[in-house]
């Protein structure tokens, strides 16, 4: 075991070439994959927007609801992934197999529960986002678009959950290229069939919003097929997949350990995701225009956010592997370097987003007032990006050492205790502009950054959990 030594300021801020080369090898495929995913999401959004503002708003509402499911899957698989990264760092392939099996079982259960929930309560959930000020005709049309889109998208939950199990395990072992290739090919399929089915090009029918949903579901099955076939054809590269389906037995002690650390993470992701859904609902009381503008803002900002989000995922991988190998000082050094890198990247990407803010909304076929509102919201998102990036990297650092209860308090509790009450009060009891409300709510992340800085500095997360 490496001695836990003090670090110099320079060691914390700057790495050597080997460090940046290693981080680049891990993070670049993730950035490419996720950025392309979000570019295609933007193109999807624009194509749906060509149909009209109401279809775009209906799709945005369903997207926010499904986002909670996505986070539940990510939370459940990431909890096991903490162990997977450390098992891989220790060279324990059987341990990685067990964590993969755990992911499959839990994600299947979550997917089944989500499908039942959305079939039973999808309509009232959608209606909560339609402002009382919306005309009856517009409200009925938005609801109809959203219901049709949701029903088709539920089919895509099955391949999505399975893909996350495979892709997450591959990334935890440092193998990020195959998930990237699968995602890129799936995005091509998604884009092509979006164009064909939304607008009815060639012999294909004009399906509008339903066509967008069908294209997305089809692309998810393509992505799953590529990842599964590619991974099982190269088991010498992915040895943890050898014999992985011979049994689903997982040692009870490991299941207990994963549950102890996974449950706070799963609850955190679901509470954070539902918190984001409630925030959108708070903003939606200002009218359907606010929902449309926020949809444009979030879709565009997400492309630029992928740099710090990918660096956060890379932090969990590289720091987790250091902890699993018992290089505790190396883990601390790596964490501080990743925080510095994330903050610097956010300054650059935030500036780029602010520069692009007046131009990108113009590709949408919507009212000029919505474009102008989206531009102002994008500028606020750009201003807050360094806060988002620093807090995200702190979150993944704490999580890498298994401190999932602390991350639960740090992330979702903050959302529900600070962000949601502020958005609720400001949107309902003040006459503040939606842009000002958005800035106040997101600017509160500076408190989260300060709390995370103290926790990372104290080193409460520096633990090898697979040795315990």
Model-derived features with residue positions:
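Short alpha-helical transmembrane segments in multi-pass integral membrane proteins
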Residues: 1-27, 84-156, 204-262, 319-384, ...
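Transmembrane helical elements of multi-pass membrane transporters/channels
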Residues: 25-44, 152, 186, 219-223, ...
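Generic alpha-helical transmembrane segments of integral inner-membrane proteins
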Residues: 31, 35, 39, 43, ...
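Hydrophobic/aromatic residues within transmembrane alpha-helices of membrane transport systems
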Residues: 32, 44-48, 59, 84-89, ...
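Helix-terminus/linker motif at the lipid-water interface of multi-pass membrane proteins
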Residues: 35, 39-57, 126-140, 198-207, ...
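Small-residue hotspots at the loop-to-helix junctions and early N-terminal turns
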Residues: 53-64, 146, 150, 213, ...
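Small-residue-rich hydrophobic transmembrane alpha-helices
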Residues: 56-116, 160-179, 280, 291-357, ...
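Short runs within selected transmembrane alpha-helices of multi-pass transporters and secretion channels
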Residues: 77, 152-171, 179-187, 212-228, ...
């Amino acid at each position: 075991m490496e001695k836990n030594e003090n670090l110099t300021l320079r060691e914390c801020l700057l790495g050597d070439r080997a460090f940046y080369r290693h981080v680049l090898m891990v993070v670049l495929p993730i950035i490419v994959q996720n950025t392309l995913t979000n570019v295609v999401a933007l193109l999807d959004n624009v194509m749906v927007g060509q149909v009209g503002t109401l279809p775009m708003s209906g799709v945005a509402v369903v997207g926010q609801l499904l986002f909670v499911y996505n986070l539940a899957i990510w939370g459940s698989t990431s909890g096991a992934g903490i162990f997977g990264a450390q098992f891989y760092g220790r060279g324990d392939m059987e341990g990685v197999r067990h964590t993969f099996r755990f992911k499959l079982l839990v994600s299947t259960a979550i997917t089944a529960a989500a499908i039942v929930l959305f079939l039973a309560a999808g309509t009232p959930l959608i209606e909560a986002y339609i402002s009382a000020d919306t005309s009856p005709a517009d409200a009925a049309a938005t609801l109809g678009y959203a219901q049709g889109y949701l029903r088709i998208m539920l089919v895509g939950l099955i391949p999505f959950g399975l893909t996350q199990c495979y892709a997450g395990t591959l990334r935890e072992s440092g193998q990020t290229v195959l998930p990237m290739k699968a995602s890129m090919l799936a995005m091509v399929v998604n884009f092509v069939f979006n164009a064909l089915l939304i607008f009815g090009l060639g012999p294909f029918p004009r399906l509008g919003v339903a066509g967008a949903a069908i294209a997305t579901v089809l692309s998810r099955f393509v992505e799953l097929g590529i990842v599964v076939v590619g991974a099982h054809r190269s088991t010498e590269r992915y040895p943890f997949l050898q014999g992985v389906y011979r049994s689903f037995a997982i040692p009870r002690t490991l299941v207990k350990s994963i549950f102890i650390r996974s449950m706070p993470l799963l609850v955190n992701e679901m509470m954070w995701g539902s918190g984001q859904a409630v925030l959108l609902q708070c903003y939606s009381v200002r009218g359907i225009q606010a929902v449309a503008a926020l949809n444009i803002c979030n879709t565009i900002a997400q492309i630029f956010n992928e740099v710090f989000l990918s660096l956060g995922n890379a932090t969990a991988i590289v720091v987790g592997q250091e902890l699993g190998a018992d290089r505790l000082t190396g883990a601390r050094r790596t964490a501080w370097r990743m925080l510095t890198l994330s903050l610097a990247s956010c300054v650059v990407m935030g500036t780029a987003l602010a520069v692009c803010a007046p131009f990108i909304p113009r590709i949408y076929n919507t009212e000029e007032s919505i474009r102008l509102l989206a531009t102002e919201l994008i500028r606020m998102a750009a201003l807050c990006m360094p806060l988002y990036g620093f807090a995200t990297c702190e979150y993944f650092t704490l999580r890498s050492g298994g401190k999932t209860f602390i991350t639960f308090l740090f992330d979702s509790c903050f959302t529900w205790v600070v962000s949601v009450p502020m958005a609720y009060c400001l949107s309902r009891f003040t006459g503040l502009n939606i842009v000002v409300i958005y800035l106040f709510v997101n600017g509160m992340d500076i408190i989260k950054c300060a709390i995370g800085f103290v926790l990372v500095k104290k080193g409460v997360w520096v633990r090898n959990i697979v040795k315990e």
